């Protein structure tokens, strides 16, 4: 097989996206690693550091910065692969004229755990010195380059995620090894690719008292059934088990000039022994499994290389895990199964398909990556700034971790209808929270039919009602609180029970989510969030209105709007009932948490919810016009006008103690008491950002928007980025959550700065987020929020960076930068602030098409 074409073309090389040398890998992923801040009732997961995900939505393998397996994502369960034996059994090794080197810079002793087998050097071949390693992250692809005395090896991981068809959902991956003889001698080379079996892992819940979906995984020690296979020019090993239908394949195409041998079983702690080679590159002996041992399989590939010659070898990995299994015992067949009608040959057929298709995956992926980079560099702000354009490109591509990691179910019925669900994160295992998904266009971009189904679920929730009482907040989380409630009813007399025990679902409210993993299977369509009573939140309905309009404009699906219009109008009527003070802005119950920032207590009208409400009304007005509903439009316009007049009461034009000019909407104001909170809230223009991005005219005048952005930029800056809130004098606020830097908020902020002509400031925000993601080891696990300054946590010796929770979908908002540029171009060309649906519909298909 000839070497594949390099990624270099017309000023674009994937190595420019993000490449770091070996010593910097250690600095970033070990010494600079972000810790976890204890905020709330429990400390979240120190998430496995990841540079690539091999597989597909609902089933993927995490790859560590050292090229080793470190986690399995299986139908919403994050299964930690902490065993040293499992990790190092995934490391390829190369033998050049009899001398073998493991293709990782990680030393086996570095991975020791207290309960793991001690690492002795004769278990493994020597590693590559870190100075001879480089790492390129170009999500969803990865390259690791190794320089050895006589050869150079590039290990490239190629994903089907952007393949553009059914293969996107097939849990496949190909590792392409490019081996180059850099010497002046003819070399005899054997490449050995081992893999641990991930079939029938023994899983134990990591934190049984918490709400997460995280498990410790241990390799199976019984029931292994591994078989060699040879089919239609492909050769490999299928790893199975007597205890499950799951199977895993490791395979290579048969190639001229390459001798192939397979080792069906090797004990994970006996790499050098069980994978000992003969002089011809074949395995010295084949063994059978014994009880209480864990196993993997391996392939050896032996070839001769002339001086300066190279050879490219693809190795396919297939995870044939046909069933998605859940905590309540429910099972659903994965969609890919329908593409392989012969059950008995399915695993081998999957590996064969990967071997045949990977070059198309690669060319399509590089074409899309280049298109993203080119579209950024073509804008006035980035013309001539290649480094800045690459920075933004890698931030955008990084958010493709979400569909590879957080998809928890994907099914297709007999009529071809697809349903899928996505996790908020593995620590807060809620399914498609509507307030979180609102920020990201990734689902609409990649899977518009799934996005439509999800949106329909939230529209349907408006009419749903369940008066059954349930516990909320501490009483939902702690059995001690529930016990106290039952045994001491007298202590609750005269208290509001809204956040203690109240109805499960009130009619007219929008569901927060579509379920939670610890409660049952993900297709139940029941909102399980109970940290606060979101029946009375005031941001969920406006966000749904904007989301519906966005989807209709980007897909042209007017039937969706027609079918749901009456329900949407009922939802608005229900929301307006939460306007208790009659100022036109629904404020919810006093002293209650009332929006996505669920540890932030507000009073009266607040800048975030007021602008969200106006954005929702603006979306409803536009939809009424699209449906020619004159009466509905007039009614909604009246609500908008009253809300706008009340928003003006939050406007402040003054100076702080430093004499700096401040122009912004204050955090909140109570028209009844006159109480005001003058903190500066970064998120006060989120709804404006959303409406601009879907081609609607900004409802806030441009001069005012610029003034707000300048105030936020100057006031809310911190070491890590722009904090959610600061006082008018730039000091930290009281709320722990308010102190935090939100990556999504910073992406929204950067895009608004760019849109309103402040490109320099926008780039500065992106630089801060680039440091968060790539300098602190958060590639492929983007944190949602993090501490604003370096802090010293309990047990730490020096101040350092900390996040609250990682691997979140909301930062997918960074993709909207591309949409905002498109909208701005269309506005200039058409000399109109409004962009029609027909001009938006082609955007994502054109962005994601092949070369």
Residue ranges, per PLM feature:
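Beta-strand-rich N-terminal accessory domains
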Residues: 2-114
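Aromatic-rich carbohydrate-recognition surfaces in CAZymes
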Residues: 94-98, 181, 340-365, 426-585, ...
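The feature captures the catalytic groove of carbohydrate-active enzymes
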Residues: 166-168, 173-176, 233, 263, ...
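Active-site core of glycosidic bond-cleaving carbohydrate-active enzymes
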Residues: 432-463, 541-543, 562, 566, ...
